[in-house]
Amino acid sequence: MADTSQKPDKATSAAQARQVIDVFHEISTLLNAELDRGTLSICISLIENGVNPEALATVVRELRKDADEVRRQIAQGVVQDGE
C-alpha cells in the first residue's frame, strides 16, 4: 500500500516553493531586474547549491550585455548566419 503521508508534504512543499518564487518575482519586478519566474527558480537553486550570489549576479549581467550586443548587431545586419 502506498504511503499517503508523503503526498500532503510534497503538495505543501510545492506550494511553498511557488510562494517563494512569487515573492522573489515581485521583488525582481520592483527592482526592474527583468527576471522571469523560471530564471529566478534556476538562480535560487544555484544559490541553494553553493553558487556565490554576487558571482551569479555578475554572470547574469554579462550575459545580458552579450545578448544586447548580439541584438544590436542583428539590428544593424552585422551578424550573419553561422556566426
UniProtKB/Swiss-Prot annotation:
Required for gamma-tubulin complex recruitment to the microtubule organizing center (MTOC). GO terms for cellular component: cytoplasm; gamma-tubulin complex; gamma-tubulin ring complex; interphase microtubule organizing center; mitotic spindle pole body; spindle. PANTHER family: MITOTIC-SPINDLE ORGANIZING PROTEIN 1. Keywords: Cytoplasm, Cytoskeleton. This is Mitotic-spindle organizing protein 1. Its main location: cytoplasm. InterPro entries: MZT1. The keyword tRNA processing does not apply. One of its GO terms (biological process) is gamma-tubulin complex localization. It comes from the Eukaryota. Signal peptide: none annotated.
